């Protein structure tokens, strides 16, 4: 197994969190009363129980580096995630950033911000 780091994100309700991410191709790898791990290909997200979380006040976030950001964005839209400036869940379209990369954003039902970054910028870095 390769060494890796995974984000630890809050979930108000594991059933709801799993249902949301399963629509985006993630599957449950592990789950008990206080912890859940979801995986989609090489992407892994870990969730801890946080039933009292206020999604509007959440400051949790992480970055997902994707080989095909445009396809993941299309998948989010195809399952009904709205492109809007407020509320949750929501998606923000991919845009070229000043730093040279392409980035979109997904806010999940618990108010967690997932920055979606196209991998191309890191292709030449080893």
Curated annotation (Swiss-Prot):
CDD domains: BLMT_like. Pfam families: Glyoxalase. PROSITE patterns: VOC. Keywords: Antibiotic resistance, Transposable element. SUPFAM superfamilies: Glyoxalase/Bleomycin resistance protein/Dihydroxybiphenyl dioxygenase (SSF54593). The keyword Repeat does not apply. One of its GO terms (biological process) is response to antibiotic. Residues 1-119 form the VOC domain. InterPro entries: Bleomycin-R (IPR000335), Glyas_Bleomycin-R_OHBP_Dase (IPR029068), Glyas_Fos-R_dOase_dom (IPR004360), VOC (IPR037523). It comes from the Bacteria. This enzyme is encoded by the kanamycin and neomycin resistance transposon Tn5. Belongs to the bleomycin resistance protein family. Binding protein with a strong affinity to the bleomycin family of antibiotics. Binds to CL990; an antimitotic-antibiotic compound. This is Bleomycin resistance protein. It comes from Klebsiella pneumoniae. The lineage of its organism: Bacteria, Pseudomonadati, Pseudomonadota, Gammaproteobacteria, Enterobacterales.
